[in-house]
């Protein structure tokens, strides 16, 4: 990338790659951010994630401001206009600077003939902004979710629907997990206070701290030395519920990027841990996290559906299966999920989960424990999945983790607490039938 760049164009192109090519921001942004200054890295993330969060509103605004949509080869200008509207509505960038940089983006895109159009549309929005935004709040798009997902959430959680939608549309809190092998949580809170980082302890999770304001990990005391890890509170519940012991052989299945693997080793540093993921690039991040925390585990690239291909005959005392899922519990953290997922994906994911769960059960020792987890809030992937599994596996004894009337524990996203997550803990009682 050249030294001189137009950040608005980079953002517009990233948005296009998500919406037109189905790529995720999590994969797209790191290489785009690498050559940028810290300030511009943060701004690029704000623009891209923010646009994904409020996409229906921006699309609606453009329909009001333009006589006809930009299509075909003009589509990149459509996304550049989105970047302009987002800056004017949701950032503290001075309007004149936001407008000037966005207009100049047309030149950087080699579409200078659109400078006048971009300038005119954004200035018209500035004049009509209060009325347009008020009108947008009266439209169906105000929920900022695709209709299929709204219907599924409403059907599953009618009483909590508004809370879930609201939480999904907010910026996520930043949670830390203190490495108990280095510091107590209270000691680390004192270190944060000494660097003017305000934080509060979780009321139930022993290692969890929430920052009052998110910050760059470079500001966190001892981050590079493995004193602390960024991990949502709900995700921290996985290793705690698994309750690993030092003498055990433990499988972390679908383990990338390794946050739960390292948490297992913080709780049981003498355990033998195998971390398996089907994606080689994501598995490399497990190595990175282990190295940062000074830990060792056997990292394997393998398909959870075919454990005989990689387990070398091993059976496991405990298995953590953080199953691939719709990620509907972490939309606030990954708002592009709303536009990457399709209604038909849910049944396909549920079948994949079933296959991995059944395969994992086969390599669990008698008397062993399996914790099934997802970051979904949809019953087909969670309680429905576990109910079907229990019906097919009489050797599976469900451990009570939540509501006794339904299998498993379902957490919903809460603005100042954890993401949406599901857990079901099962013990293998007898020989399989």
UniProtKB/Swiss-Prot annotation:
Documented EC number(s): 2.1.1.176
What are the UniProt keywords, alphabetically?
Answer: Cytoplasm, Methyltransferase, RNA-binding, rRNA processing, S-adenosyl-L-methionine, Transferase
* Annotated GO MF terms: RNA binding; rRNA (cytosine-C5-)-methyltransferase activity
Q: What's a single GO BP term from this record? A: rRNA base methylation
* Family of the protein in this entry: Belongs to the class I-like SAM-binding methyltransferase superfamily. RsmB/NOP family.
| Function, in words | Specifically methylates the cytosine at position 967 (m5C967) of 16S rRNA.
What protein is this chain from? Ribosomal RNA small subunit methyltransferase B
Organism, by scientific name, is: Sodalis glossinidius (strain morsitans)
